[in-house]
Every structure is written in structure tokens, then in C-alpha cells.
């Protein structure tokens, strides 16, 4: 419950700061916007992880769908969120957090002594590629809230 309150609070702050919108001063962007983007990204990922852990803890059967399919479905939500933040808010920093989380999933699933679930490993790799390409394209097209054409 605390994570959900934090998530909602950060979403409200993010919107009030107008992250990704024009008119922000460079120092405000560097010192405030980027930090809130990263923080919101981590709280988003942590909320998803905590909900997943809770469902596992209560032995939720996932409506009979395999855990690997559920994992990939949840990872897909992460990909969609990252892409939405890139394209709606020009926010690559939120997306970088999701990319980093996918790297963590990949590293954990490929570590010695860990059950390697090929579907989850593949989803992590594909997710990192999709998000990374979207980030690079946003940078190339100068669709990043840190880069303003007037400052180039």
C-alpha cells in the first residue's frame, strides 16, 4: 500500500513539474526533472515487483497461466510504459530505468545456479533492444526534454 501511495504521489509531482514540457530552466531540468524521472521509474518498477511478490506469496494461480507467461506480460507493461514516457514526455530517463531493470532480470536469469527460463530471458533481451532503440531515436531526433533546440 505504501508503494502505491508513493507511486501516485510521484505521478502527481511529475505532472505538476511539467516534465517534458517546454519552458523549464536548464538547471531545473538537470537538478529536479531528471531526478524525479529516475525516481518515478524506480518506484514504478518496484511497485510492479512488489505486487508480483505479493501474488506469489499468496499462492495466486495466475488464472492457470504459466508464471513465465505472466512474467513476460508484466515485462510488456514495462516496455509500454517506457515507450509512453519517451514519446509523450520526451523522457528517456524513466525509460533508462526500465532498461536497467530488464538488464537485472537478464543477469539474474542467466546467473549460475538460477533456473534459466528462455522465454523470460528472451523477453528481457527484446525489451532492452526495443527500449534502447527508442532512446537512441529520441536522442537523434532531439526529442529529449534535456535537449532544447534553442540551446544547440
Task: Report residues per predicted region.
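Alpha-helical transmembrane segments of multi-pass integral membrane proteins
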Residues: 2-15, 32-50
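Alpha-helical transmembrane segments and their membrane-interface exit regions
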Residues: 4-15, 102-105, 127-133
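Membrane-interface helix termini and inter-helical loops of multi-pass transporters
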Residues: 21-25, 53-65, 110-114
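A loop-to-helix transmembrane entry motif
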Residues: 32-40, 60-74
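Membrane-helix interface "capping/anchor" motifs
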Residues: 83-96
